[in-house]
Amino acid sequence: MSRSYNDELQYLDKIHKNCWRIRKGFVPNMQVEGVFYVNDPLEKLMFEELRNASRGGAAGGFLPAMKQIGNVAALPGIIHRSIGLPDVHSGYGFAIGNMAAFDMDNPEAVVSPGGVGFDINCGVRLLRTNLDESDVQPVKEQLAQAMFDHIPVGVGSKGVIPMGAKDLEEALEMGVDWSLREGYAWAEDKEHCEEYGRMLQADPSKVSSKAKKRGLPQLGTLGAGNHYAEVQVVDDIYDEYAAKKMGIDHKGQVCVMIHSGSRGLGHQVATDALVAMEKAMKRDKITVNDRQLACARISSAEGQDYLKGMAAAGNYAWVNRSSMTFLTRQAFSKVFNTTPDDLDLHVIYDVSHNIAKVEQHVVDGKEKTLLVHRKGSTRAFPPHHPLIPVDYQLTGQPVLIGGTMGTCSYVLTGTDQGMTETFGTTCHGAGRALSRAKSRRNLDFQDVLDKLADLGIAIRVASPKLVMEEAPESYKNVTDVVNTCHDAGISKKAIKLRPIAVIKG
């Protein structure tokens, strides 16, 4: 029996101006409470979605994000609370922008591929340059074209980096270390990657041959959907000290942002795991509120196989972003007729938005080992954390937040408050407000392209028809999302970037 909207509201209360609590009972079997972070406009979107669902309207076939946060709170072994970040929107199993941690000491605790997502280690890398906007504006069309020519983009795009089956096995195991050995990365690139660009538990034998077949031709490709490479300029600096540590010292400085993931390989790893886990759930008598939350005990063979395969797909994504960094450096080199080194094309940082990792956190005053699922959310560790690079020990970890086509992106830093409230996690981007299908119905791709041209943004798109799905109108306002995290204290604004050229799948 479904409840009325007013009945649903009985389970929700506001903790402070940017945070709501979802009390136990909102959905069956909740082990812990849920919370979600919003400001006024984002709050309105969340409650509208719930209201529509209680009238029988579905969001693109998914449950409303609030319900999904509640269903995650009912998973075995979850600890502290199920957390929705300001960019949260309905997804497969977990909402995108929903993170949760599971107690590794609890034999019942599970791992759920729906808590990582199909694009394993979809993430963002930011490069800086010593160029100024005035250097790039006159040649931005050539630069956009050079990047479009160098980086293979689009749905079925194939890579230009030579790769045999043996190379793929090594890349899956070694991550950025493979790129380094093959000459596609600089030694310091690795220092500025989450996990140093290599998850050590990766086991290529846990990646099916079907997944490898999908991944082999796609390495060093951008893919379609919300993936992009953008030439950006620094629009505002909120934290000069943190910005300086990142090599950003003035407005107008040019950067490059690369947003991509593990392509078809990661998708197949997730699909394979979901099939195996359905069987494991029957065997181990695990019940969940939503079939999409298929999971397995962390300690089970299925749980371990998935974590090892997921880590390999994660490594593939880091190699992918490294390959695209190599191609970007070549494109800049060609246009500006000088070496990437002379252009200071260094990696500021590289973060993952879809991953599960074993981490140490303090919960109720006790140090615990947890499996932290971050889906559509970003690790944001505070200053002095042992897992962040030496360069950022005093500022906190850089967090890269991609906007949507034609809107701003942000660099944030991690905080101590985020460490206690959200397991050192913050938002990842704008978060969809319209489903892809709805975007295609409501928006015309030519209008979207014209609007970008009006903003003075050079654009190269492999599949124009996909542009509507990624139009700024399809998304929540990234500034709302970032400000909510800043005001709530779970991350701190450092730099704002605006695009001048976009390359898209």
UniProtKB/Swiss-Prot annotation:
Catalysed conversion reaction: a 3'-end 3'-phospho-ribonucleotide-RNA + a 5'-end dephospho-ribonucleoside-RNA + GTP = a ribonucleotidyl-ribonucleotide-RNA + GMP + diphosphate; a 3'-end 2',3'-cyclophospho-ribonucleotide-RNA + a 5'-end dephospho-ribonucleoside-RNA + GTP + H2O = a ribonucleotidyl-ribonucleotide-RNA + GMP + diphosphate + H(+)
Binding site for GMP: 226-230, 353-354, 402-405, 409, 428-431, 504
Domain of life: Eukaryota
Catalytic residues (positions): H428
EC number: 6.5.1.8
Recorded GO MF terms: GTP binding; metal ion binding; RNA ligase (GTP) activity
Keyword flag Cytoplasm: yes
InterPro entries: RtcB, RtcB-like_sf, RtcB_euk
Alphabetized Gene3D superfamilies for the sequence: tRNA-splicing ligase RtcB
First-listed, main subcellular location of the protein, grouped into a coarse class: nucleus
Pfam short name (any one): RtcB
Subunit architecture: Catalytic component of the tRNA-splicing ligase complex.
Full protein name: RNA-splicing ligase RtcB homolog
Gene: rtcb
